[in-house]
Amino acid sequence: MNTQMTPALLEPWALPTAGKIQEIATREGIDAATTQLYQSVSESPQHGAFIRRVDEISTRTPPRKWQAGAPLIIVPGAFYRENPRSGADGRLLREQAERLDCPTGIIPIVSCGTLKQNARIICDWLLDQGQPVILASLSKGGADVKMALAEPDAAEAFKNVAAWVNLCGILNGTPMAEWLLSRNPAALLNRLYYTFRGQGLGFLRDLGYGPGRPLDCALQLPHHIRMVTIAGFPLREHLSSALARRCHRRLTYLGPNDGSLVLSDVCALPGLLYPIWGADHYLRPQTDVNQLVLSILQYLDEELQWRLCPQS
């Protein structure tokens, strides 16, 4: 599932810093920097064992049915109501969970709501739950969860959250938000397109990247929550659409990226990371994401079962 690359030039146990990766990108090119960052993640003690475990689980047939007793609850991405075909509603996650007979649900956040607005909705929803749950967020939904974790009553709200699957989450903002709100002619055309579809982009002001922005804060992840992040690690040759290539190129000055996320930021997140070689922010071109999601859910089921279903 995770294609092996040529030997890395960095020690496999040391994840390079953002500065080091940018130096490599300047000296050797963005593709070389992306390759080395990917290899460092894949070969690190923290993430490598997890990646190998997930890959081993993917070879099992048929998949074992869900044992943990906790439902998978989706925190959807932007436009999940207006454009469910985009996958922002978490359909892929729900379908794989249902293959395991895992119950699913969705937190009804505002499709284009502010971070503060959706953070409150998430906390209120979780406060009403009396059982363990596993959260799974998509893209902007990850930012909404991050801000929910900063709410005053987050400790109480998240006490029953056993794990969090962060699928391409924009946890630190994205430089693309500023570009999309700029006076660039292409950005103006993009905004006009969304306006005609009745889809406002005002929420992008919350997703700005850099010092002083709303997401320029530490992720306050409770120790009891097991976090798993899934993100794409593409080279330029992997990007099959003109839009994906333009987005990737605009972020190249920050180092390896998926067209929306800066990958050195992704690597600095707590928890475990599964890097998908060759995929962009929307996990394109076509990869076997279905099998990967199924395997990660099985991994969480095995890891959490003893804690969520104690034996008498």
Placement of each model-derived feature along the sequence:
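Glycine-rich His-Gly loop
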Residues: 75-78, 139, 169, 232
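C-terminal catalytic-base region of ester-bond hydrolases, centering on the histidine
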Residues: 222-312
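Short aromatic-enriched loop/helix-cap "lid" or pocket-rim segments at secondary-structure transitions
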Residues: 86, 175-180, 238-243
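Active-site catalytic motif of lipid deacylating hydrolases and related acyltransferases
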Residues: 64-133
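A generic structural signal for well-ordered alpha-helical segments
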Residues: 97, 126, 220, 292-293
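Hydrophobic/aromatic beta-strand patches that form the interior of the parallel beta-sheet core
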Residues: 73, 105, 163-165, 228-230, ...
